[in-house]
C-alpha cells in the first residue's frame, strides 16, 4: 500500500504468492553494455521459504506512484540469502540479474566461420534459451571469416564482439519479461520523458524532474589511425584514419595509432577506425545528474528543460544509472518509519552521440591472447590425403575445439610457414591430413593462426627407428594415393658417412651448364632395363687401368666418319661364326713381319721370305666362287627422353594491378586491355 508520498514498491518471485515478500529497499544498477544488477532487501512473514522456489526463478520489481506503474524490472534470481528472523518478519536478500547473466556461467573455446556478428550473437543467446532479443542495426557488418571465442565466458565474448563491431546493448522491459536490444547508432534510442530542472523544492506531484545536473568536458584523443596487413595485398597499407568532432576546446594533435587494427579489408577498417574513435571519446562531452524519475533507463533519451544554462536544455541519452528505493514501513518489528523514497543518479552523453564501449573497460574486455604456440592436426575432406588452397594453406583441428568435426570445415584456411619463400621460388612442403603441426598466433591473436612447425607423435613415427639411427638426417616423402616414397638421406656416423637417394619412380636432373663428378674410389651402376645416352658434342673417355665390356646380345657401333683404333700390343678378336669386313673402296692389311690366313689345314702365309700357299689343291683362275658375308645389320640408338624445364607459375597480377596494390586506389579485376598492357587507366 502506498504511503503519503504515493510511492510503493512491490515484488513477485517465481510461482510464490504475490504477498510473500514486501520490499524494504532496493538498489538497481543499469548501464549500456552491462547486465543490470538489482539488489533487494525483503521481508516476509514466512521464516522458511524454500530456496528452490526462489533461486534461478523469474523475479519482477514494480515501482508505483499513486497507483500508476512507473517502472518494472524483470530478471532472474541469482543469489538468495535468509537474514534475521523476528516475531513476525524474516529478512531476505535477493540479487536479480538479466537472463543474459547466464552467459557468464559458461566458459568456452570455439570457432565461428563465415558468419555475421549478429548471427554469432544469436547463436550464443539461443544456446542459453534466450529468444527475446532484437537487433536495431543501422550499419552493415561484414561476415567474419574466422572468429574465435577463446577461454572466455560467453558473456565476455558477447561484450567483446559487440564492442569490436561498434555495437552496444540495453534492456527493455514488459510484463514478466525483458528484451535485449543490440544497436550500433544513436538513432536506435527510444525517446523518454521531458524532465524539468528543479531549482527549488517542487514535489513529485508537479511531475518528474532533474534536481542536479553537472556538465563536463574532457580532453580525449582527437583522431584515430589504424593500420593492418593482409598477405593477399602485401604492398597495400590498409591504413584508415578518422577525426573526431567537437574539438574546439582541445588540440587536434592527440592521435591514437594502433597496429594491428584487426581487419583485412577496407570497409571493415573504416568502420573499426570510427568505432575506436567513438569509444575513446565516449565521455569527452558528458554529464552527471540526479532525478526522481524511475522511468529512466539506458538506451533511452530525455529532454532537459528549465536549466539556467540554456545550452544544456537539449536531448541527452542515459549511458548508466543507479536507482535507490527505501520503503521502511516493511520492517514493522524494527520500528520502520519514515516515508517511502526513491531517487537515482545517472550519467549522460548527448543524444546525438553514438556511445560505444572502450575496449579494455568493464563493458568490453580485451580479446584473450594465446600464451604460446599450440598443437593442431591437419584435416580435410574424406578421401583426401593432401588438402590445400592456391596459397598452400591448410585446415586444422585444434584439441580445444569441441565443435569441430576434423574435416574441411574445422577451421579457416591457415597459412603455413616454409623454410624459404620468395617470388615464385623457395620451398614448399604441404602438411598432409593427419599430420601434427605447431601453430603460432600473430600478435597472440586467436583469430590469426599460422603453422610454424611440424612434430611427430605416437602414431606418426619418424622414418627410422630412434635412437638407433640418430646419426641420420632424412627427408622422406610418401606417395600420394599409393604406396611408396621418395627419400634423401644423410648418414653421419663416422666410417659410414653416406648420401642416399631413393626415387619411387623417376629421377630427372637438369643442369643448365656444366656438371662435374669426382669419385675418389669405386662407382657402381646397375640399370635393370635400358640406358640411353646422347652426347651432342664430343665424348672423351680415359681409362688408366683395364676396361671390360660384356654384351649378351648384339652390339651396334655406327661412326659417321672414321674410326681410329691404336693398340699398344695385340688386337685379338674371336667370333663364334663369322667375321665380315667390307670396305667401299679398299681393305689394306699390313704387318711388319707376317700375315697368315688359315682355314682348316690350308693357309696362306706372307712373310719376309715370300708367299707360302699350303692346301690339298691349289686353284688359280679356275673353279669356285667368293663367299659373301652377312653384311652390316646394326641398329641406330634411340634418343633419350630428355628433361624439360618446369614452366614458371603464372604471374597472378599484371603490372597495372601491382601498381594499384602499392597505392591506396581501389582494387578490382583486370580488363582485357590490362592483360595486353594497353588500358588507358
UniProtKB/Swiss-Prot annotation:
EC number: 2.4.2.31
Catalytic activity, as annotated: L-arginyl-[protein] + NAD(+) = N(omega)-(ADP-D-ribosyl)-L-arginyl-[protein] + nicotinamide + H(+)
Xref: InterPro entries: Gp5/Vgr_OB (IPR006531), Gp5_Vgr_C (IPR054030), T6SS_RhsGE_Vgr_subset (IPR017847), T6SS_Vgr_RhsGE (IPR006533), T6SS_VgrG/RHS (IPR050708), Vgr_OB-fold_dom_sf (IPR037026)
Region annotation (Disordered) ranges: 621-640
Compartment(s) of residence: Secreted
Entry GO CC: extracellular region
Main EC class the enzyme belongs to: transferase
Keywords: Glycosyltransferase, Nucleotidyltransferase, Secreted, Transferase
Pfam families tied to this protein: Gp5_trimer_C, Phage_base_V, Phage_GPD
One GO MF term: NAD+-protein-arginine ADP-ribosyltransferase activity
Family classification: Belongs to the VgrG protein family.
Functional description taken from the UniProt entry: Part of the type VI secretion system specialized secretion system, which delivers several virulence factors in both prokaryotic and eukaryotic cells during infection. Acts directly as an secreted effector with an actin ADP-ribosyltransferase activity that disrupts the host actin cytoskeleton, leading to a decrease in host cell viability and an increase in apoptosis.
Annotated protein name in UniProt: Type VI secretion system spike protein VgrG1
Organism: Aeromonas hydrophila
